[in-house]
Amino acid sequence: MKKRVQSELSKLSDKSIILEKPRDRQFGHYATPIAFSLAKELRRSPMQIADELAKSFESSSIFEKVEPIKGYVNFKLSESFLDEYATWALKNESEFGKDEQGETILLEFVSANPTGPLHIGHARGAVLGEALSRLGKHLGNEIVKEYYINDAGNQIYLLGLSIYLAAKEELGQEVQWPQEYYRGDYIKDLAKEAIEEFGKEAFSDESLIDKLSEWGKEKMMELIVSNLAAVDIKFDHFVSEKALYEKWDEVFAILKEHDAVYEKDSKVWLKSSEYGDEKDRVVVREDGRPTYLAGDIIYHYDKFKRGFDRYINIWGADHHGYIARVKAAIKFLGFDPDKLEVLLAQMVSLLKGGEPYKMSKRAGNFILMSEVVEEIGADALKFMFLSKKADTHLEFDVDMLKKEDASNPVYYINYAHARINSVLEKAGKSAGEVIDTPLKDLNEDAKDLLFEALILPEIIEDAFAKRELQRLTDYLKALAAQFHSFYNKHKVIGSEYEDRYLKLFLVVALSIRVGLRLLGIEAKKRM
């Protein structure tokens, strides 16, 4: 709708016009500050320019009113334009809010170590990545979702060792546990399965540990993929860190060629401080083994060689320090580091009845994503994880998400959608019977509700551009509240406005349905 207004204005002016939303609806639906930017060029006051622009824009049928106010030009959209757009949206649900942005984007998220089940920290990044992908595709971008498997480090050996020792314990043997190992019932379960798989006798030989490491990694990846599928998240690619190390010689040669590394104290250092890092970083240890950072450098070399327009990584907040060093490496490799965006997902704290949520016995010292999904459902989990900016700490009480009242936003929004279906049923009308009803002579409450329902495409575009999904969750909460308020205030069935209000409600339901779908949530028809 905003683009349609801008398109109309471009016919009447050769200037690029930026539209803003006035804080107070009495000043119209949109406003432009263009008179201020033209004032210096034309050597005239913004008020004079705004007066003239307002007169030239009045001729458009899409405006009910064009008014200059303190140098701004304010626009109030006509009922006929809003009705025309509403009718189109209802008849073209699959196209509503779509665009043709056309970027190719490689989106990497989750990338949890394959050494245990997914916990709620992983879940936040998973939900954010999936929602970003859905919004981006809706806006006409080609998005590839990728999971980076960290399978080259010592943690994979520790997984195999933990399974090995747990199996020996299961077989009644005395075990000396090391300081570092993986614990939790999932390790015991893997140990029992490993005994079945490899036989009791195999656990007398420590050479089995390497096999168990690879076997355990595969089992954990199966579990992770299953956990993600339970919340409707599927990846296009899985990339193994271990497999990528084959490219280290190639990458290291480029770094040396570009004078990006040097030797000191029997180690090889990356000159990352030259490009924004606080100090140089080790990429090769004294024993010749590449560091964790080297793995990241290889992976980003592999990414950028694939030629996407943009690369988005979703990392845990504890990886903040890695951004500058990875971007420095990208620069040294001859690529544009500005093409990489890193979104940081902060910690999640769960409560239950006001008390800290109990840690999972199965995982040891984590709260499992699967257990929370089982308790509150995937939809509630997704909505709450998207309800705040990713880089802010999130705390919520799972008991609140079980309530059937306005304090539970997921329920409240779904109730609005289900309520609209119920109203149509009570009225004995189908969508097809009211879809072409002209939305005219509406009161101000109805006009405001209609406009709010129709600005969903702008919210989608804004949420994706700023990578802030809470803009969409906030919008859906506000739209549902506005609908409930309207319905409680105005008579619908049996009134002279019945068909007009039913059509208005269909537009509200459409925006709720499309908005929730982009968050990975299916709107409920009945509750």
Curated annotation (Swiss-Prot):
Known catalytic reactions: tRNA(Arg) + L-arginine + ATP = L-arginyl-tRNA(Arg) + AMP + diphosphate
Disulfide bonds: none
The keyword Protein biosynthesis is assigned to this record: yes
SUPFAM superfamilies: Anticodon-binding domain of a subclass of class I aminoacyl-tRNA synthetases, Arginyl-tRNA synthetase (ArgRS), N-terminal 'additional' domain, Nucleotidylyl transferase
Subcellular compartments: Cytoplasm
One MF term in the entry's GO annotations: arginine-tRNA ligase activity
Entry EC no(s): 6.1.1.19
Chain span(s) of sequence motif 'HIGH' region: 112-122
Entry-linked Gene3D superfamilies: Arginyl tRNA synthetase N-terminal domain, HUPs, Isoleucyl-tRNA Synthetase, Domain 1
Pfam families on file: Arg_tRNA_synt_N, DALR_1, tRNA-synt_1d
CDD domains reported in the protein's UniProt record: ArgRS_core (cd00671)
GO cellular component term of the entry, any: cytoplasm
Enzyme class: ligase
GO biological process: arginyl-tRNA aminoacylation
InterPro entries listed in its UniProt record: aa-tRNA-synth_I_CS, Arg-tRNA-ligase, Arg-tRNA-synth_N, Arg-tRNA-synth_N_sf, ArgRS_core, DALR_anticod-bd, Rossmann-like_a/b/a_fold, tRNAsynth_Ia_anticodon-bd
Location, primary (coarse class): cytoplasm
Ribonucleoprotein found in the keyword field: no
Keywords, sorted A to Z: Aminoacyl-tRNA synthetase, ATP-binding, Cytoplasm, Ligase, Nucleotide-binding, Protein biosynthesis
Family listed: Belongs to the class-I aminoacyl-tRNA synthetase family.
Subunit composition and interactions: Monomer.
PANTHER family: ARGININE--TRNA LIGASE, CYTOPLASMIC, ARGINYL-TRNA SYNTHETASE
The protein, known as: Arginine--tRNA ligase
Lineage, uppermost ranks: Bacteria, Pseudomonadati, Campylobacterota, Epsilonproteobacteria, Nautiliales
